[in-house]
Amino acid sequence: MKNIIITGGLGYIGTELCKIYSGVSWNHKITVIDNRFISERVNQLRNWNINFVHGDILDKGLINKYCKDADIVHHLAGITDVPRVKKDSNDSIDNQIIMVGEKGTQNILDVISDKCKIIFPSTHVVYEGLDKVKNDINEDENTKPVLAYAISKANNEKQLKDSGKNYIILRLGSVYGYSTDTARIDIMPNLFSKIASQNGTLKLFSGGRQVKSLVPLIDVARCFKYMEERNDIS
């Protein structure tokens, strides 16, 4: 039996991951930590034998209580409702995004044991400042974040690499897909689907030659579960 923690378990990826764990939740101790309380979803978690803790990753005492004996931490919590372009940003918003990401991640790293595996979702936008489009980027490419969300993720990657802990970083493309619990209409494919279903018209610029990295939500959730299962991947 593993002691598994999912921070941000009521979010877009976390919700789908919990659905996958619902099939094996009786074989493990699974706890979701989220600073939101959505009664229907919390009740569903409890029906799946998944514990719910209403709390924040910035609360180090709470993180210590639940993470110190963890075998696995899926660290999904953080601010995701972020500015997509520089003109929508300001110092206050940027500082909050970076602070929550860094402090929350450090709180977890400070209390987990060396045997614990922490699995973290980074993002392809850590490359957003590259001077030209590349189709063959791998994990050894130097990152070049510009906006606060990407800067926060790049900083979190460094925290994990410098921690000496057992970690896995997944640099995800733009996650998309239908979720019965969480709508993310701000994501391009989801927005396109909504417009198309309403007989809307999509306007393409630059001849429709834009390139975007996409990955289905269900595949991301399955990947997190797979990373938890494989002891030879770290």
Give the label of every model feature segment.
Residues 158-212, 217-226:
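NAD(P)-dependent short-chain dehydrogenase/reductase
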Residues 26-37:
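Conserved glycine-rich Rossmann-like NAD(P)H-binding loop of the short-chain dehydrogenase/reductase
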